[in-house]
Amino acid sequence: MGAKISEDHPPQGNGGPLSNDPCSAGGEPRGAHLSRDGDGSVGDKGGDDDDDDDEGVVGAVSLTEASDKKKKKKRKPKKKKAKKATHQSSPPRVPLSELFTPGQYPTGEFLEYEDTNTARTTAAELRALGRKQLEDPAFLDDYRRAAEVHRQVRQWAQESVKPGQTLRDIANGIEDGVRALLGNQGLEPGDGLKSGMGFPTGLCLNHETAHYTPNPGQKDVVLQYEDVMKVDFGVHINGWIVDSAFTMSFDPTYDNLLAAVKDATNSGIKVNAAIQEAMESYEVEIAGKTYPVKPVRNISAHNIQHYRIHGGKSIPFIKNSDQTKMEEGEVFAIETFGTTGRGRLYDDVGIYGYKLENGGPSPASLPFASAKKLHKVIKENFGNIVFCRRYLERLGQERYLAGLNCLVSNGLLEAYEPLADVKGSYSAQFEHTILLRESSKEILSRGSDY
């Protein structure tokens, strides 16, 4: 989820490194059929007598006696324990707790720092703070588990999403998969703070570049063969958010656009300064006309803090003189956006989502009871995690628009608008979450796909 850069305030941040390379998931039914034994045949050991004259009578008596004496009881079917799942289903519904032993979730890709990298400080006190977090096994386990959920769900999305589907169905499919793999539907107060979506699933088509998700009251948008769709979603466990994005297209016309942005993201993970050069080395031919791929200038990568998708530091991927440092123990979302348009985004119509703001007036001072009630629901279910109106309706909230507007106007909620380039242009996005270590970076969200 990109951080928009204000035109009035230059971005803070600088680049920090990672690399390319790659997850997979398949599906097979869970459990096993219970076998049932049939009833035994009654009187199968009839009498056998040497007296031929009485053979028929004796035989009849023997059958009767046998049926009286040897009535076989029906055997109760043996209950077999369901086999532990070894593969992910499709759509993904097997919780990761059934596929992995806690503490043994896959690690990300490790990439050593370049010798020439000066972006990180070596101040002892800052390094000590970062190291304390890195040594916490629960912190690493939460992040790696969230990353594995992201990998498995996005693999399913890449295999199953096709033209003709609505964006609403695609978003619901991704989010249902995330919640199922986490084993938490998030419907009770407080559940959403334990684990869930890190922010609403972004599904941006063509010139729409960031921060669009289908919401109630909007007309269904159907994915077309000619569309270029950015898929950006986050997974959090105990407030530690994995933020990763990819772009899908079905028409090979746009292959170079996707390749340019993927290359730029991988270059930025290694050395931030190389992002712009990598992206601008590509061109895209659309309908007989050649377009240069331009980096989007007023949106940036960012650090991630506990329960906060945008932690305050920005990483522009164009040349700049900013000297903000990336520190050991910090988590960053390294993302790039490329476009055939102007390379500068504007606020589009509508609202993507909302985030609860700290500070501001007390909810008790709000003029509407509905706003006070809604503030309580948001705080209990999302905290500082970005949410959207679809999520409120999933919790059973009704007639909430006036309350939302009241919270926004009183500074208790921040609203995010969709961001777009000029109409008729096409844009792409790739993004990974990285963890900075003392001597290397761990690309937490790296998979076999990107």
Curated annotation (Swiss-Prot):
Catalysed reaction per UniProt? Answer: Release of N-terminal amino acids, preferentially methionine, from peptides and arylamides
Comment on bound cofactor: Binds 2 divalent metal cations per subunit. Has a high-affinity and a low affinity metal-binding site. The true nature of the physiological cofactor is under debate. The enzyme is active with cobalt, zinc, manganese or divalent iron ions. Most likely, methionine aminopeptidases function as mononuclear Fe(2+)-metalloproteases under physiological conditions, and the catalytically relevant metal-binding site has been assigned to the histidine-containing high-affinity site.
Q: Which cofactor does it need?
A: Co(2+); Zn(2+); Mn(2+); Fe(2+)
Annotated region (Disordered), positions in chain:
1-100
Composition bias (Basic and acidic residues) maps to: 1-10, 30-39
What the entry lists under HAMAP family is as follows: MetAP_2_euk
| Record protein name field | Methionine aminopeptidase 2-2
